[in-house]
Design a protein with these regions (language model features):
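Short, compositionally biased "basic patch" segments
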Residues: 34-75, 85-86
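Non-catalytic, alpha-helical, charged scaffold/linker segments
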Residues: 1-52
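Glycine-rich beta-alpha loop elements in corrinoid/cobalamin-binding modules
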Residues: 3, 8, 12-15, 62-196
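Compositionally biased, intrinsically disordered low-complexity regions
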Residues: 26-29, 58, 67, 167
Length: 196
């Protein structure tokens, strides 16, 4: 990889500096990692341009999750036809659902770039497996959904837990098993009589 005749090179390589100077003779591995990263960034740009405008290796549709003050753009995008990347993601989800047959599926959403994929999966689950309950937690809900009032998000998930997820998850499981009332849920948003 360091010899630069193994991977194709596109626009990210136009900005490349003198690698020998930057990494020296002892930095072959670091240099190879840097070149591989540039290749992956070029590949991501290509996929975004040609296949799916929301693509990102770890941040799918990140710009949609960044506008936490309004759910409108994200809601509209969730109702558009799926892209080939989303179709692949949903096919993987279907395999896991058929393999494990869960009654509860939870999504960890640490960053804005994980929100769209989690909601898209939740939407698909609600359409194809309406008896499965769907939970969501993680860093993004902790910071951006703390004061959620838009009930539309609950078309895609049933529960949003905040902060340390263990206690809310245990209470959610107790609630779903019929051992406690919904009012006993800890740090968890849900709809009760169409109100968050």
């Amino acid at each position: 990889i360091s010899e630069r005749n193994f991977l194709p090179e596109a626009s990210k390589f136009e900005q490349i500096e003198d690698l020998e100077w930057a990494f020296g003779t002892m930095g072959i591995r670091d240099q190879a990692r840097h070149i591989a990263t540039l290749y992956l960034e070029d590949l991501s740009d290509f996929i975004t341009e040609v296949v799916d405008p929301h693509f990102g290796f770890s941040r799918y549709a990140e710009r949609l999750g960044m506008s936490a003050h309004s759910f409108d753009a994200l809601y509209d995008e969730l109702h558009k036809p799926t892209t080939s990347i989303a179709d692949h993601m949903l096919a993987l989800l279907k395999q896991r659902i058929e393999e494990y047959k869960p009654s509860l599926v939870c999504f960890s959403v640490p960053f804005p770039g994980n929100l769209f994929a989690a909601l898209k999966c939740g939407q698909w689950l609600k359409q194809h497996y309406p008896d499965i309950r769907i939970g969501m937690g993680g860093g993004y809900p902790n910071t951006e959904l703390r004061s959620i009032s838009d009930a539309r998000v609950f078309q895609f998930v049933d529960y949003i837990s905040l902060d340390d997820g263990e206690a809310p998850m245990m209470e959610l499981l107790n609630y779903l098993d019929g051992h406690i009332d919904v009012s006993m849920l800890k740090r968890t948003f849900c709809l009760v009589d169409s109100v968050v």
